[in-house]
Every structure is written in structure tokens, then in C-alpha cells.
């Protein structure tokens, strides 16, 4: 008899962002799998085994979790944010697609979480108030020229852009290159939001403009939102600014994009 595999989104940090469904799945699991820092956010429970691994070992982690489920173990695989956004849900599906036929019969559920772009947007107003897209700047699984083409297309089409994985120690140059690319298509005054570790003690939100956006404001714990030509900043005397993208696009702007 096989077990059950829950692919669980932990949200961006604080336990307040963990959904009730996710909390139940974590409590019911006999075995927990995930990137070490994410597992550290899950309270230890008696009788549960914990299997931390590196953030570049998603395929092996997914295969091991599926194997344990096939043996009758109740398993939870955790992801920060939402498991379906640059996270473990796709890795699990990839392994099911290429693995043993028996894995296709397993009870697998995907439990959503609050992804970083929504948590950051909520902190600052409504920068994703109109059409938007999400792009990962990591070139571990896709070539950098493809990332550049997607940035070009998104900026030219008038999307607000959420940038995941803006840089790391192994690739410190990529965020600067992405900003350089976006400057070809967007005004220098385009609002840019840096949201780091939302919901955690070291949370930091900063608002700047594309002209001055720099590497120093980002790391792997940062989510960057680049606004559109229509995105606006509301300065407030005793409160942090609000950033929003209007729901309506002026006809002249829409025709220029088309």
C-alpha cells in the first residue's frame, strides 16, 4: 500500500503566512524533505524523519520522496513560497513523468503557499495591479540569452516584472545585466521594489527607480519587482510610500505597445 505525498508551500517566512491546509499536511507527514533552510522553518515533531538537501538537488530529492511514498510512507516535500513557482512541484512532476510507472498511481497533492512576489507586492501597495509576469534570473536550468529575450519581451509588452533569484555568489553579475537590458525599454524613473525576507525578522523593503537600481540591494533572499511606464509612487509624510500599477491602460499607451 502506497503512502501520500504532499508538496507544500511554506510561504515567504513567518508562520502567519502558512495556510491551514499546509500546516495539517506537515503535521501528518512521517517524513519531511526539502532544502535545509526551508526545513529549518518547520517545527520538529516526534516520530518524523527529516531529510535536508542542497538547493541544487531538487531532482534527487523528488525521486527519493516519491520512492518513499511508493513504500507506504506519508511524505511532505517543502518549498519556500508556493511549490508551483520556481520550486518543487515541477521537480516532482518531472520525476513522475520519467520514473517508474507505479509513481503515476501515487496519491500526490500540491498545497499552495504565498509566493514571494505576492508577499512583497502586499507590503508596498499594488505594483502588480495590472498585467504582470515572473522571470527567474537563474541560468542553472536555462541559458542566459533566453532570459534576456524574455526580459525584452516582457518590458516591451508593458508587463510589470517580478524577478526571482536576482543574483548569488556564483553569479553576481546577472541582476546588473538584467537591469541594463530593461533600461533599453523602460524610462529611468520606472519604480523598482526590492523586497527581502518578507515576514522574517530581517525583512527589508526598498523603493528606488530603474536608473539607480543596483546589485547592492539584492541577494538570493530578495524578490525584485520592476514596474511599468504607468506604475506610480504615492509619497506619504508619515508612512512608507505606496506603489501601484493602475488598472486601466490609456488607449495611446496600449496602441504604442501594439
Task: List where the protein language model places each region.
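Class I S-adenosyl-L-methionine
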Residues: 1-108, 114, 214, 251-254, ...
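A contiguous loop/helix-start segment that scaffolds small-molecule binding in enzyme catalytic cores
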Residues: 5-7, 156-258
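Short, surface-exposed amphipathic charged segments that create phosphate/polyanion-binding patches used
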Residues: 65-71, 122-126, 147-151, 205-212
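Class I SAM-dependent methyltransferase SAM-binding "motif I" and its flanking Rossmann-like core
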Residues: 85-157
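A short acidic, often aromatic-flanked loop/helix-cap motif at beta-alpha or helix-coil junctions
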Residues: 56-61, 116, 140-142, 199-202
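A polyampholytic, Gly/Pro-enriched intrinsically disordered region
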Residues: 73-78, 126-137, 155-159, 211-220
Amino acid at each position: 500500500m502506497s503512502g501520500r505525498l504532499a508538496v507544500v508551500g511554506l510561504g515567504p517566512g513567518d508562520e502567519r503566512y502558512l495556510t491551514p491546509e499546509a500546516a495539517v499536511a506537515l503535521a501528518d507527514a512521517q517524513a519531511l524533505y526539502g532544502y535545509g533552510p526551508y526545513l529549518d522553518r518547520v517545527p520538529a515533531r516526534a516520530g518524523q524523519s527529516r531529510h535536508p538537501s542542497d538547493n541544487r538537488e531538487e531532482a534527487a530529492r523528488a525521486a527519493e520522496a516519491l520512492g518513499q511514498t511508493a513504500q507506504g510512507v506519508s511524505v511532505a516535500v517543502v518549498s519556500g513560497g508556493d511549490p508551483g513557482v520556481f520550486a518543487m512541484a515541477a521537480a516532482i512532476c518531472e520525476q513522475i513523468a520519467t520514473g517508474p510507472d507505479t509513481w503515476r498511481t501515487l496519491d500526490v497533492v500540491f498545497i499552495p503557499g504565498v509566493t514571494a512576489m505576492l508577499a512583497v507586492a502586499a507590503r508596498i501597495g499594488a505594483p502588480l495591479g495590472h498585467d504582470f509576469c515572473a522571470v527567474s534570473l537563474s541560468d542553472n536550468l536555462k541559458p542566459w540569452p533566453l532570459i534576456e529575450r524574455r526580459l525584452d519581451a516582457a518590458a516591451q509588452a508593458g508587463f510589470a516584472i517580478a524577478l526571482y533569484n536576482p543574483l548569488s555568489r556564483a553569479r553576481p553579475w546577472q541582476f546588473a545585466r538584467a537591469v541594463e537590458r530593461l533600461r533599453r525599454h523602460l524610462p529611468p524613473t520606472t519604480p523598482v521594489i526590492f523586497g527581502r525576507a518578507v515576514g522574517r525578522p530581517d525583512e527589508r523593503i526598498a523603493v528606488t527607480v530603474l536608473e539607480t537600481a543596483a546589485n547592492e540591494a539584492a541577494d538570493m533572499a530578495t524578490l525584485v519587482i520592476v514596474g511599468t511606464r504607468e506604475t506610480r509612487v504615492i509619497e506619504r509624510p508619515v508612512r512608507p510610500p505606496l506603489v501601484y500599477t493602475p488598472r486601466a491602460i490609456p488607449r495611446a499607451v496600449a496602441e504604442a505597445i501594439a
